[in-house]
Regions:
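Terminal, non-catalytic protein-protein interaction segments that mediate quaternary/complex assembly
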Residues: 20, 24-308
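Accessible peptide chain termini
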Residues: 1-2, 27
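Targeting/processing segments of secretory and organellar proteins
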Residues: 3-4, 10
Length: 308
C-alpha cells in the first residue's frame, strides 16, 4: 500500500507547482496543510491491513487504514479562515454541529439540522453520555456551579492569563454509556498579548485521539476555527492560532483513490470569513451568524463510504 502511494505521488508533486504558478501563486494555506498531511500519511504512514480493527464497512469488511501518529497542524486564524477550497466544506452544517455540542450541550440528534449522527443514536435519538452531555455537566468551583463551557468563558473574561482554561469530554467513568467515544475530546485555550496591540489574542489547541482524514479533517478544523472566532468575539479578543493535534490521523483503504484525486487538484484563494459582529453573547450565536464570501472550490465529492 505504501509503495503504491509513493509511485503516484512523485509525478503529482512535480506538476503541482506548475499548475499553481499558472493560477497566480495565490492559494489557501489550509489546502497546503491538507495536501502535505495527506502526502505524509501516504508516504510515511503505517498500514493496519491484516490487524484486528474495530471499524467495518457497511458490507462487513474490516476497514483498514494507512495511519500517521502525532500529526500537528497549525492554522493562523488572523491570516485566513482554514476552510478547504479543494472541495467544499459545508460551513453552516459544521457550525450547527459545533453549536449542538458547545452551546446546546445536547446529546440528542433531534436537536441537529443534519443526519450525520444517526448511525450512533438510539431509538430516542440519544448518543448517550457523549460530547455535549459532558460539556453540560455542572461542577463545583469556588465561584459557584458551572459547566465546562461557562468555566472557559468565565476564566477568559476574568483571568485570561490562566494556564488552566480547558475542556475535556473523555470522561472514563462514563465511557460505557457513550454510543461513540469522543474523537475530538479536549480544547485548551491560551491568551497572549501581542506587542503594540490593545486587545488580547485568543489561541487554542484541539486534541483529537483519532481522525478520518477524508471525511472529518477539514470539518473539524472549520468547526473549531468558528468556535475560536465566536469565543474571541464575546471576550473582546483577537483570534490567533488554532493548533490541531491528532494522535491517529488515518486514511481508510477505500478512501485512498479519492484522496489521490483530491490532492491533485489546484487550490483556490482562501475565502473571507464573516461572523455577525452584533452577537456579544456566546449563547445567542446561530449557524446563520457565519458566512464565507468569495468561496470558490473544486467539485464536491459525494457518496464517500463511511466506516462504522
Amino acid at each position: 500500500m505504501k509503495a503504491r502511494a509513493k509511485e503516484w505521488l512523485m509525478p503529482f508533486f512535480s506538476g503541482f507547482w506548475g499548475r499553481l504558478r499558472r493560477r497566480g501563486g495565490n492559494m489557501s494555506l489550509a489546502d497546503i496543510t491538507f495536501i502535505n498531511m495527506c502526502k505524509d500519511i501516504l508516504e510515511n504512514g503505517t498500514s493496519t491491513e491484516g490487524e484486528k480493527v474495530r471499524p467495518k464497512w457497511p458490507d462487513g469488511t474490516p476497514a483498514y487504514t494507512i495511519k500517521k501518529f502525532g500529526v500537528v497542524n497549525r492554522y493562523d486564524l488572523s491570516k485566513e479562515f482554514p476552510i478547504l477550497t479543494l472541495r467544499r466544506t459545508a460551513l453552516k452544517s459544521a457550525t450547527d454541529e459545533m453549536l449542538w455540542i458547545w452551546q446546546k450541550k445536547s446529546n440528542n440528534i433531534h436537536d441537529l439540522h443534519s443526519h450525520i449522527w444517526d448511525e450512533w443514536a438510539d431509538e430516542d435519538g440519544s448518543i448517550g453520555k457523549a460530547y455535549g452531555y459532558q460539556l453540560g455537566v455542572k461542577h463545583q468551583y469556588k465561584e459557584g456551579m458551572m459547566d465546562q463551557v461557562d468555566r472557559v468563558l468565565y476564566d477568559l473574561k476574568h483571568n485570561p492569563f490562566s494556564r488552566r482554561i480547558l475542556t475535556n469530554i473523555y470522561v472514563h467513568q462514563d465511557l460505557h454509556e457513550m454510543n461513540l467515544y469522543p474523537c475530538a475530546y479536549s480544547m485548551t485555550f491560551n491568551v497572549t498579548q501581542k506587542k503594540g496591540e490593545r486587545r488580547l489574542t485568543l489561541n487554542a489547541i484541539l486534541n483529537q485521539r483519532s481522525q478520518d482524514v477524508l471525511a472529518a479533517n477539514n470539518w473539524n478544523v472549520v468547526q473549531y476555527a468558528v468556535l475560536v472566532h465566536m469565543i474571541a468575539q464575546v471576550c473582546d479578543m483577537n483570534v490567533g492560532e488554532l493548533v490541531h493535534v491528532i494522535a491517529d490521523a488515518h486514511i481508510y483503504d477505500r478512501h485512498i483513490p479519492i484522496i489521490k484525486e483530491l490532492i491533485e487538484r489546484t487550490p483556490y484563494p482562501a475565502p473571507k470569513f464573516w461572523l455577525n459582529p452584533e452577537v456579544k453573547d456566546f449563547y445567542q450565536f446561530t449557524r446563520n451568524d457565519v458566512r464565507v464570501d468569495d468561496y470558490v472550490t473544486g467539485e464536491q465529492i459525494r457518496d464517500i463510504p463511511i466506516a462504522i
